[in-house]
């Protein structure tokens, strides 16, 4: 695959994580750059691994993976988005749950996995092409690290304007990504 195509693929694959990171950044009270970088590193690491996993699965069982990946992503994103919306509607005081707790490692990993399943599907497709899968996966991971970190910082400025509605908006974004993944699968 040509270098330009790899870069375009990498940034294209990072867009779901970018959108989710904006929502995450908006729900936190002024996240620090270190929190944004942590999010970027988690999203980037997962986004690096999923095309590699997809590539391996593509070699072994491409038909099954391609038939189910969109449903898995859809269910995970609907669940996570619904949870965020419910928490945003319930409200509660900021002391009830610290921003760091709402931004826990496992919640980030789950969100990263849900937004990276399309990269796994791309990895399945790459198994049938002459590509350097390691270089491609690293490019996707680096682009995702950059875009997720940037998304968190953008969310930092949007969050104070939205207040408690930021969590609802973040949930809507995740649900929207899930619907978009399902829509794209059925309507190309």
Swiss-Prot record:
Family: Belongs to the MntP (TC 9.B.29) family.
Locations listed in the record: Cell inner membrane
UniProt GO molecular function: manganese ion transmembrane transporter activity
Any one GO cellular component localisation term in the record: plasma membrane
NCBIfam families linked: PRK11469.1 (NF008546)
Chain segments annotated as transmembrane: 3-23, 41-61, 66-86, 106-128, 143-163, 168-188
Pfam families named among the record's database cross-references: Mntp
Protein's name in the database: Probable manganese efflux pump MntP
Alphabetic keyword roster: Cell inner membrane, Cell membrane, Ion transport, Manganese, Membrane, Transmembrane, Transmembrane helix, Transport
Annotated function: Probably functions as a manganese efflux pump.
Membrane topology: Multi-pass membrane protein
InterPro entries per the UniProt record, alphabetical: Mntp/YtaF (IPR003810), Put_MntP (IPR022929)
Top-level taxon: Bacteria
UniProt keyword annotation of Membrane present: yes
């Amino acid at each position: 695959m040509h270098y330009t195509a790899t870069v375009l693929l990498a940034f294209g694959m990072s867009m779901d994580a970018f959108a989710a990171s904006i929502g995450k950044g908006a729900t936190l009270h002024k996240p620090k750059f270190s929190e944004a970088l942590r999010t970027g590193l988690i999203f980037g690491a997962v986004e690096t691994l999923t095309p590699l996993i997809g590539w391996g699965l593509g070699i072994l069982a491409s038909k099954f993976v391609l038939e189910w990946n969109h449903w898995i992503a859809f269910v995970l994103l609907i669940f996570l988005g619904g949870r965020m919306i419910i928490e945003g509607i319930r409200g509660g005081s900021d002391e009830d749950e610290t921003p760091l707790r709402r931004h826990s490692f496992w919640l980030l990993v789950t969100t990263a996995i849900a937004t990276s399943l399309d990269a796994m599907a791309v990895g399945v497709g790459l198994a049938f092409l002459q590509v350097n899968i390691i270089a491609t996966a690293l490019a996707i991971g680096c682009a995702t690290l950059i875009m997720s970190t940037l998304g968190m910082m953008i969310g930092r400025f949007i969050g104070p304007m939205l207040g408690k509605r930021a969590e609802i908006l973040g949930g809507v974004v995740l649900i929207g990504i899930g619907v978009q993944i399902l829509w794209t699968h059925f309507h190309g």
